[in-house]
């Protein structure tokens, strides 16, 4: 009855009540707003940029392209804000700004975003995915041979962020490197980002729908892989995608 319900509520501490109301509000936001029902979480330098660009072409899929200021955006980073905000010069750090990314959703069935560090910072990402987006989000993971992935990441950092070490020295000095320099991009964890087992295991344990793609399959049989992705997202598998261009590999 209403009295026992009131007594039950009064058994909670103040902090517990606040947390309960916050979770309730978060689920209300999920229902009210057009928010992602799938995420491309990584790994970095494993074909995620190409997949993102191909998904944008599908009429049943919405991926954000601009932020509130009209600037181009691909990787919001929002769900791992506490891990990367100090290190990265790009990202969406505010909940209202994150929601704005999806304001132009119309009739698209699949709504998603791509942030490659969601795989590496899987504990933080999973916690916030569940809190902000719910438990039914579909997860897409691309994996590449760890050695090839590491060297590709090194080349990327050397070109865009000016890596100060040789590849060999960077591998030897990797332990503790992020802690020693708070301005470094997480991309410099060349070896650590290729230790996929715990990352993938955690996502598979926490979410019912996880789709894993091998980079080599995506590179060599992109049409077949894309069809598998479309089936996973439950969108039209016959849509023609221009997959001739490879992006940022």
Predicted segment positions?
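Canonical radical SAM enzyme core domain
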Residues: 144-147, 218-220
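Active-site rim elements
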Residues: 82-87, 115-116, 185-194, 214-216
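PAPS-dependent sulfotransferase catalytic core
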Residues: 1-121, 132-137, 146-180
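Glycine/proline-rich, positively charged
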Residues: 170-173, 194, 198-201
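Hydrophobic/aromatic beta-strand patches that form the interior of the parallel beta-sheet core
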Residues: 112, 138-140, 211-213
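Alpha-helical packing segments of well-folded alpha/beta enzyme cores
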Residues: 98-101, 125, 196-200, 225
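The conserved 3'-phosphoadenosine-5'-phosphosulfate
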Residues: 70, 74, 201-249
């Amino acid at each position: 009855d209403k009295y026992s319900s009131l007594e039950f509520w009064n058994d909670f501490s103040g902090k517990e009540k606040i947390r309960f109301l916050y979770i309730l509000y978060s689920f209300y936001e999920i229902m009210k707003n057009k928010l992602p029902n799938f995420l491309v979480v990584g790994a970095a330098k494993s074909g995620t940029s190409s997949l993102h660009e191909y998904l944008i072409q599908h009429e049943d899929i919405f991926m954000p392209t601009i932020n509130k200021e009209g600037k181009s955006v691909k990787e919001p980073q929002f769900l791992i804000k506490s891990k990367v905000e100090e290190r990265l010069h790009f990202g969406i750090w505010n909940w209202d700004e994150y929601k704005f990314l999806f304001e132009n959703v119309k009739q698209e069935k699949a709504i998603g975003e791509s942030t490659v560090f969601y795989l590496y910072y899987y504990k933080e990402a999973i916690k916030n995915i569940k809190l902000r987006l719910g438990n039914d989000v579909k997860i897409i993971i691309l994996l590449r041979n760890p050695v090839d992935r590491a060297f590709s990441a090194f080349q990327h950092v050397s070109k865009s962020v000016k890596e100060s070490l040789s590849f060999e020295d960077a591998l030897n000095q990797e332990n503790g490197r992020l802690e020693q320099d708070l301005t470094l991009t997480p991309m410099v964890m060349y070896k650590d980002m290729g230790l996929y087992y715990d990352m993938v295991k955690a996502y598979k344990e926490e979410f019912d729908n996880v789709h894993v793609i091998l980079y080599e399959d995506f590179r060599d049989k992109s049409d077949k892989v894309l069809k598998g992705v479309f089936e996973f997202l439950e969108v039209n598998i016959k849509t023609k995608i221009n997959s001739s261009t490879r992006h940022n590999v």
